Design a protein with these regions (language model features):
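Conserved catalytic-core segment of NTP-binding enzymes
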Residues: 27-109
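Phosphate-binding/switch loop-helix module in NTP-utilizing enzymes
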Residues: 1-35, 42
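Short acidic-hydrophobic, aromatic-tinged amphipathic segments that line or gate anion-handling sites
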Residues: 111-115
Length: 115
């Protein structure tokens, strides 16, 4: 259960947008996670489609190809602006560079790494 209402979340985002040139919103749990009832994180993001650019952050680990491609496909079908993909290096076994290049070729999105 969320500790906030959708109205409170909208108010917080609008306040942050009014005070800043750039607002970073970290989403944990996936795009289809419900916020209230059947209203998902994706639905909420779509409210800001004209004002936003999405940066996908994914753990750089084996098997990420399908997860990243599904996320990109869902965002594109929702007419959202995707800026780039960031792969976060961790302790997991990393995916091969060829797979990351394949994702780039399919999605036409640039990528970078962070630790």
């Amino acid at each position: 259960k969320n500790d906030f209402s959708l109205v409170e979340l909208r108010n917080k985002v609008e306040k942050a947008i009014s005070k800043n040139d750039c607002v970073f919103i970290r989403i944990i749990g996936g795009l289809l996670l419900p916020l209230e009832g059947y209203y998902s994180i994706l639905d909420f993001i779509c409210e800001y489609r004209k004002k936003s650019e999405i940066v996908i952050v994914a753990k750089n680990k084996k098997g990420l190809l399908n997860q990243v491609l599904l996320t990109v496909d869902l965002l594109k079908k929702s007419d959202l602006n995707i800026g780039k993909i960031i792969y976060k290096n961790g302790n997991d076994e990393k995916e091969h560079e060829e797979v990351l290049e394949e994702i780039k070729d399919i999605t036409h999105l640039e990528y970078e790494f962070i630790n």
